[in-house]
């Protein structure tokens, strides 16, 4: 990749990480997509990397076509295109170029798979799977309960601190995508699991706002990968070895069970921390107090 392309990509990645608050995982995905694109452009016509304004729609389409030829799925190609559009939007905003050449390229249609979720009658079986005596077992039980009770994302759970939890009010302060903070309620089962885990951990914390809620050996913050591995073991056992099970399965389960119990779709959207599904969604935001009341009433573990 030519130096100008490398520097431009570095500036863009710094922008989305430090100014937009994107997670390290998301930044890495953007980097992978865009390095592939810029390496293609260098081979396609290296002169273009000296002036991004000369990269046109045809060059981008040529790259996307090459991606299909290499056997990539529509989902992967759609993600590559989204990364390219974001890069050029940044360059337009920075007044490096005048127009985004990717703006009118249609995103490939991606088949939406019905997400895997745990049936309500299997939840208790899932929660009883971790060893109820050991520290790791109590930690895993608390993780499962919190995933199901709140629907938070994997990275959000891994980033929780002791100070993120208000056990008296049964509320969780979550830092989501784009560093957006939201308050999420949880119920008694999650509260009891958390209290049992923290009691077993048996330490006092001088700075709860900076002390990890979930830890592994050496009292270090639990790794995302460790959470995935532990949760996947329990889910696969309950789901009969079905593929595709992951911590995100419990997020889908959270939303599905609320919907099945007649919760309002917009309330679910708020609880999950989703972005607006349309430009009009901002006008239909529910009252936070009402949202908590709906959660307490509708979620099986919300009381």
Model-based region annotation:
Residues 1-303:
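Conserved catalytic core of the tyrosine transesterase superfamily
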